């Protein structure tokens, strides 16, 4: 288990923002990390852009297109993380797709991610049954391979939870990422099932966009993950987005910490 990830859940309910690297630019992404940390983020998910992000809705898909057409590469993302690590020790995990890792070379990717100071990896398109080829390498280099658990059978939730590292990413609804007006999944029951098997922090993501939802989800879990609503601000304000994102993250963090 990565120490930094574990610690990010020890200070109360965690708020975990997601941004796409290089949207609007890698320089702005770096500034966003510092701003979100100042606003109270406990852990940050960095998306490495990919041409076919199957788990993403239109907002994050558009961000991937913008980042790639701006010339973002995996190596440039690594260089940016290295720069961030000179100024910040906030826990950070990559969220990307198996193809990004494969095309870079799996061991080369994981080794480099660990070297530049990343703490974990989320691969939403790799099912539990196929995580073996990443699992051993991640453990070898001290990177937590974060499991996603979607609304599914009790047996499957227990099976995935048993092998969880870092934290468990509880997917609030089936389908792609994006902002939803209501979340119907019984997150509390899902979290209880995980906890029966393993004492792992559970953070909820997919579909959370406003403070009311964040507060509700934090009440049933250990933390809240928000992506599309933040990426939407990056798309809307471009290079001017940093203060808007900072303000939004602060409002969400405040909601998550309300008792």
Which residue stretches match the model-derived regions?
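Catalytic beta/alpha-barrel core
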Residues: 69-72, 117-130, 144-152, 158, ...
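Glycine/Thr-rich beta-alpha phosphate-binding loop at enzyme active sites
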Residues: 62, 70, 158-196, 233-235
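Hydrophobic faces of well-ordered beta-strands that scaffold small-molecule active sites
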Residues: 15-19, 44-46, 92-96, 121-123, ...
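Glycine-rich phosphate-binding active-site loops on the catalytic face of alpha/beta enzymes
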Residues: 41-52, 118-122, 127-130, 172-179, ...
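N-terminal amphipathic alpha-helix/helix-capping segment at the start of soluble metabolic enzymes
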Residues: 1-19, 80-86
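Catalytic cores of alpha/beta
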Residues: 26-36, 152-162, 204, 208-224
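Alpha/beta catalytic cores of nucleotide-metabolism and tRNA/nucleoside-modifying enzymes
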Residues: 77, 192-200, 209-215, 219-259
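Active-site beta->alpha loop and helix N-cap motifs at the rims of alpha/beta catalytic domains
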Residues: 37, 48, 61-123, 256
């Amino acid at each position: 288990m990565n120490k930094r990830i574990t610690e990010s859940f020890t200070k109360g309910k965690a708020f975990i923002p997601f941004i796409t690297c290089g949207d609007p630019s890698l320089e702005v992404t770096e500034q966003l990390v510092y701003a979100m940390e100042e606003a109270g983020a406990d852990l940050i998910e960095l998306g490495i852009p990919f041409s076919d992000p199957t788990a993403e809705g239109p907002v994050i898909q558009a961000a991937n297109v913008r980042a790639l057409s701006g010339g973002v590469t995996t190596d440039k993302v690594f260089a940016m993380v290295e720069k961030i690590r000179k100024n910040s020790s906030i826990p950070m995990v990559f969220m990307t797709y198996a193809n990004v890792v494969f095309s870079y070379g799996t061991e080369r990717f994981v080794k480099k991610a660990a070297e530049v100071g990343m703490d974990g990896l989320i691969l939403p398109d790799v099912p539990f049954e196929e995580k073996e080829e990443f699992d051993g390498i991640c453990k070898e280099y001290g990177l937590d391979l974060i499991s996603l658990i979607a609304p599914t059978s009790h047996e499957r939730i227990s099976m995935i939870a048993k092998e969880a590292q870092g934290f468990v990413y509880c997917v609030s609804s089936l389908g792609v990422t994006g902002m939803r007006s209501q979340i119907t999944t019984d997150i509390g029951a899902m979290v209880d099932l995980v906890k029966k098997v393993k004492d792992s922090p559970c953070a909820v993501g997919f579909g959370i966009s406003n403070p009311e939802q964040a507060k509700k989800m934090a009440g049933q879990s250990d933390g809240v993950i928000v992506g599309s609503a933040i990426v939407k601000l990056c798309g809307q304000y471009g290079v001017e987005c940093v203060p808007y994102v900072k303000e939004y993250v602060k409002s969400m963090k405040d909601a998550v910490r309300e008792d």
